[in-house]
Amino acid sequence: MGNRHAKAKSHHGFDVDHDAKKLNKACKGMGTDEAAIIEILSSRTSDERQQIKQKYKATYGKDLEEVFKSDLSGNFEKTALALLDRPSEYDARQLQKAMKGLGTDEAVLIEILCTRTNKEIMAIKEAYQRLFDRSLESDVKADTSGNLKAILVSLLQANRDEGDDVDKDLAGQDAKDLYDAGDGRWGTDELAFNEVLAKRSHKQLRATFQAYQILIDKDIEEAIEAETSGDLQKAYLTLVRCARDQEGYFADRLYKSMKGTGTDEETLIHIIVTRAEVDLQGIKAKFQEKYQKSLSDMVRSDTSGDFQKLLVALLH
């Protein structure tokens, strides 16, 4: 999946007993020591936070999540709880929330399923089954329809080639198939798009997009914009943008969540928490390059209080 600047901050001197004790003290009695909570949550890896959760429960006989729910509030609470989940569990909860009740938040399904690796998709499916005792694929099938359902179900198979080899002949053939399926005829044959966008490696897709450009002197994005609409268009464009430059895609999403009036805190939390140990360093560099300002500075000016402090700490 290209270069992933991992930020696995495994700490020398990680002491699970000390952290559990410190968190207990931070949440005991009158008032909460938010600074202590921020310091621990932001400077431990996801695996270390799992150990802290287990230690806390074994020592104090209660779930750290429940303690946070009663002691914290607002976006600070949301972020702290997100950090107590494994990334796959957090994604699974977001997906369930997007589908439960009336109506479906398709944007969340697209954002998660179109941007995860095979291994991540498998982990999300397993977490969803474990947390909700339901199949993610069945729920997605029941909650979406038509061509959007088809592409999401294809992605849920976690069948993308993740090798490094590029087959030039295949790229040419795929480009021709995409042209025949879209621009080349009335109505779009989504099957060809699903086959290519859900199964080829990012490197292979970049070769296909190049071949497409040469073949008809047009970007694949332009064809998708002309031929599709709504959520299907959003899904295809997300897949294309991630194949072209995944870190750039997330940098754009973060920028859009903050620019103008109002802030989309859900997107901010979701991206910063789930990319923290994947490619957040690369996303930060891309953000600086594209927008001539640091992601931390923009987060600082767009958020406030303990929520701001926790996000900024996660970005360092």
From Swiss-Prot:
Entry membrane topology: Lipid-anchor
Cellular component, GO annotation: apical plasma membrane; basolateral plasma membrane; cytoplasm; exocytic vesicle; membrane raft; nucleus; plasma membrane; vesicle membrane
Annotated lipid attachment (N-myristoyl glycine): 2
GO molecular function: calcium ion binding; calcium-dependent phospholipid binding; phosphatidylserine binding
Keywords, sorted A to Z: Annexin, Calcium, Calcium/phospholipid-binding, Cell membrane, Cytoplasmic vesicle, Lipoprotein, Membrane, Myristate, Repeat
Annexin repeat residue numbers: 14-85, 86-157, 169-241, 245-316
Compartment(s): Apical cell membrane; Cell membrane; Cytoplasmic vesicle
GO biological process: negative regulation of Golgi to plasma membrane protein transport; positive regulation of Golgi to plasma membrane protein transport
Primary site of residence: membrane
Highest taxon listed in the record's lineage: Eukaryota
Sequence similarity: Belongs to the annexin family.
Domain notes: A pair of annexin repeats may form one binding site for calcium and phospholipid.
Protein name stated in the entry: Annexin A13
Origin species: Canis lupus familiaris
Gene: ANXA13
